C-alpha cells in the first residue's frame, strides 16, 4: 500500500501555482466593484450602526438613572402627605387589625347568645384547677414542651 504523503507536496505546489495570479504589468489592477458575495458598506448605514452602538453603551447609565429616580420617588426621605404614627412599628395594616380581633369576638359573642335570638343558649363549662393538673392555661402551647414553671 502506497502512502499518500509523498504525493501531497507536489499537489500542493500545483494548487498554489494555479491559484497565484501573475500580473503582466507588475501591479494588480484595482477592483471595479465589490467582490462577489460581499456588499459594499454604505456610509449612512455605517454611521447608523455606530450611533446605535454608542447608545447601547450608554444604556447602563440610563438604567442606573431610572433606578435612582425610582428610589428617590419611593423613599421615605421626602415629607409624606399622610402623617406617620410613630408609636406603631412599620407593620402590615392587617397585622394591626389582628390585635383588635379578640375584643371584637368578645363583643359579638353576647349578641349571639342573647335570649331573644332563636339560637339556644350555650353554657360554657368552667375549668376547675384539678383538670389542668396545676399547669396554667395557655392560649398557645409552650415551645418544645417546656413549661413556664418547674412542675414535674
From Swiss-Prot:
Induction: Expression has a diurnal peak under light/dark cycling, but remains stable under constant darkness.
Annotated keywords: Amidation, Cleavage on pair of basic residues, Neuropeptide, Secreted, Signal
InterPro entries given in the database record: Neuromedin-U_amidation-site, NmS
An annotated GO BP: neuropeptide signaling pathway
Localization per Swiss-Prot or TrEMBL: Secreted
Secretion signal, residue range per the UniProt entry: 1-26
Molecular function (Gene Ontology), one example: G protein-coupled receptor binding
Residues found modified as Asparagine amide: 144
GO cellular component, one term: extracellular region
Membrane-traversing stretches: none
UniProt propeptide residues: 27-69, 70-105, 106-108, 147-152
PROSITE patterns: NMU
Claim: Transmembrane helix is one of the keywords in the record: no
Domain of life: Eukaryota
Annotated tissue distribution: Expressed in the CNS, spleen and testis. Specifically expressed in the suprachiasmatic nuclei (SCN) of the hypothalamus.
Major localisation: secreted
Family of the protein in this entry: Belongs to the NmU family.
Function description: Implicated in the regulation of circadian rhythms through autocrine and/or paracrine actions. Stimulates the contraction of rectum and elevation of blood pressure.
Protein name: Neuromedin-S
Organism: Rattus norvegicus (Rat)
